[in-house]
UniProtKB/Swiss-Prot annotation:
It is an enzyme of class 5 (isomerase). One of its GO terms (biological process) is carbohydrate metabolic process. This is ADP-L-glycero-D-manno-heptose-6-epimerase. It comes from Burkholderia pseudomallei (strain K96243). The active site is at 139 (proton acceptor), 177 (proton acceptor). Contains a large N-terminal NADP-binding domain, and a smaller C-terminal substrate-binding domain. Keywords: Carbohydrate metabolism, Isomerase, NADP. Binds 1 NADP(+) per subunit. NADP(+) binds at residues 11-12, 32-33, 39, 54, 75-79, 92, 143, 169, 177. It catalyses: ADP-D-glycero-beta-D-manno-heptose = ADP-L-glycero-beta-D-manno-heptose. Catalyzes the interconversion between ADP-D-glycero-beta-D-manno-heptose and ADP-L-glycero-beta-D-manno-heptose via an epimerization at carbon 6 of the heptose. It comes from the Bacteria. The keyword Transmembrane helix does not apply.
Amino acid sequence: MTLIVTGAAGFIGANIVKALNERGETRIIAVDNLTRADKFKNLVDCEIDDYLDKTEFVERFARGDFGKVRAVFHEGACSDTMETDGRYMMDNNFRYSRAVLDACLAQGTQFLYASSAAIYGGSSRFVEAREFEAPLNVYGYSKFLFDQVIRRVMPSAKSQIAGFRYFNVYGPRESHKGRMASVAFHNFNQFRAEGKVKLFGEYNGYGPGEQTRDFVSVEDVAKVNLHFFDHPQKSGIFNLGTGRAQPFNDIATTVVNTLRALEGQPALTLAEQVEQGLVEYVPFPDALRGKYQCFTQADQTTLRAAGYDAPFLTVQEGVDRYVRWLFGQL
């Protein structure tokens, strides 16, 4: 039976395609926009049945051109939180997603899609409930508005709808994202280029490098998607994070120590790395004051209640794996 992955050449989409391949699934239609042509590299080691541009996909899918489709993993979106073209963002992330959803509902196709923790904005609690949702940018609003649509249609839906609010995802196949790539990716490249990693200094009551995020490996993101694919009776909107808030210092020290280990050098504590100039703190930029989240942490209650009980990689585990993968790509 056919599977469809939108955003298939992107970061999370390509990892889902690869994870499906590892289970023997190759009847996959990859949908994307390759205007940024170098994204094709994310699919070079993947097996797919067909490729379609996003502009032709929805109409053909709604028309039934692909026969029986078991599931759509809808990962295609503009994920640039700095994008200021609201019309583009709403058309790409909201209108397009509604069209894919409508086609899935009409055909009884499982619909698993990418939501975002950006929906929570400046909230201090990260629970899948309306009172905690206050997006700070048009990207977050586009995701929020689509989740509101999902809440309205889910009670009457005859097929699965599962949305995942991704927290700070890092891992292989993100290099095309540029400035929107993960902190781990940028720390890796900065350390190789300059011999040190730079982090923000003290801000808003948090010490240097102590601002925290829920950093989640794309390995775990793919696993959660496939778990719900295997359990089509489970619908809902779910936070997809580790449930742990870890400081940027943890990312930096893990990147540095993994690269040191690859060169046969011993691990160092954070204090030792700072003392040796391997980690450096820079003044917090004025442009980000009042617009910066110093803390995110996924509430996993809904996810765990739905039956997902596997552990999540810590920053130390996941970033170590990722740095070794990046090093192997050099």
